[in-house]
């Protein structure tokens, strides 16, 4: 598979480069695929792309892991985010990594599949689709930061459980002692068997580790601001030694005439962390 780094716009001058001890804002966000039924309900992409970009701008994220993008929709979104660049692991990328220009250089990137044969496009266990992880190794002042952006299968419980085990192995072998962020739409909640399969010697949940948190509702919002949600399928994990300053589920809406709408059927989950390597 040909790998490439897609930079959709000319690079801006480097304004700031991170160092260990500095803080970084990361978000994971499933921006919803294009379901024809969404158009009928008034939640079509043409309405949503502007509010999605507005949320990213308003919260000043340094890195965003997206899920359920598509090539032409990602191109449209990046046109609204000229201060960001995008990492695509393939021409048909749905889980890109978006990062602020000038903060990092990309040392390496790619994808592996959530299957028994992760090196090739494949699905295993009871997975309905061939799911994968988009990853990147970012450099800042001679230091490294690994990003693992995933979207687990929604159908197969065995696939979810085995994908969690695979992520344990991949993060351990690829990141080593370097700081990392493992995040995405995992399609399971914190009380599930799959969640319990994540190795706490390798990672911790930023939600439970945060110094402060804002959790007005679950991350899955049904596209309905009037419906309370208790389901959080979107998670962010970091190494045990990483300081998590803030965790938030962002209950952001936009106005469409007299109606309030969500930009996606998932709310973005965001953290503020202090970068640092293992002592």
Kindly give the residue locations of the regions a language model identified.
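Bacterial Sec-dependent N-terminal signal peptides
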Residues: 1-23
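Active-site metal-binding loops of divalent metal-dependent hydrolases
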Residues: 29-31, 150-152, 185-186, 267
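Structured beta-strand-rich core segments of catalytic domains in phosphoester-bond hydrolases
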Residues: 63-144, 152, 248-250
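Acidic/histidine-rich helix-loop elements
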Residues: 28-50, 110-127, 153-156
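Active-site neighborhood of phospho(di)ester-bond hydrolases with catalytic His/Asp-centered motifs
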Residues: 64-67, 88-89, 181-185, 205-209
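Short, Asp-centered acidic motifs that coordinate Mg2+ and/or phosphate
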Residues: 24, 62-63, 145, 179-181, ...
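N-terminal, active-site-proximal structural segment of metallo-dependent hydrolase catalytic domains
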Residues: 15-80, 165, 275-279
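Metal-dependent phosphoester-hydrolase catalytic domains
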Residues: 109, 158, 162, 172-180, ...
């Amino acid at each position: 598979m040909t790998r490439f780094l897609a930079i959709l716009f000319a690079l801006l001058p480097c304004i700031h480069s991170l160092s260990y001890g500095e803080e970084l804002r990361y978000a994971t966000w499933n921006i919803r695929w294009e379901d024809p039924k969404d158009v009928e309900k008034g939640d079509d992409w043409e309405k949503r792309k502007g509010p999605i970009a507005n949320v990213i701008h308003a919260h000043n994220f340094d890195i965003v892991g997206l899920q359920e993008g598509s090539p032409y929709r990602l191109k449209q979104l990046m046109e609204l985010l000229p201060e960001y660049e995008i990492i695509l692991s393939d021409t048909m990328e749905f889980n890109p990594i978006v990062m602020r220009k000038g903060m990092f250089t990309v040392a390496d990137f790619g994808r592996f599949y959530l299957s028994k044969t992760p090196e090739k496009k494949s699905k295993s266990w009871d997975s309905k689709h061939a799911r994968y992880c988009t990853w990147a190794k970012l450099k800042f002042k001679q230091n490294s930061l690994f990003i693992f952006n995933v979207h687990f299968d929604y159908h197969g419980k065995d696939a979810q459980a085995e994908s969690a085990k695979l992520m344990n192995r991949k993060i351990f072998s690829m990141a080593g002692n370097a700081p990392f962020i493992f995040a995405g739409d995992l399609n399971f909640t914190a009380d599930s068997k799959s969640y319990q399969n994540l190795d706490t010697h390798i990672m911790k949940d930023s939600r439970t580790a945060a110094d402060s948190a804002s959790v007005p509702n679950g991350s899955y919002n049904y596209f309905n601001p009037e419906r309370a949600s208790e389901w959080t399928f979107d998670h962010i994990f970091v190494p045990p030694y990483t300081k998590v300053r803030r965790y938030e589920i962002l209950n952001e809406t936009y106005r469409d005439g007299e109606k309030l709408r969500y930009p996606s059927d998932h709310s973005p989950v965001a953290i503020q962390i202090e970068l640092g390597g293992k002592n």
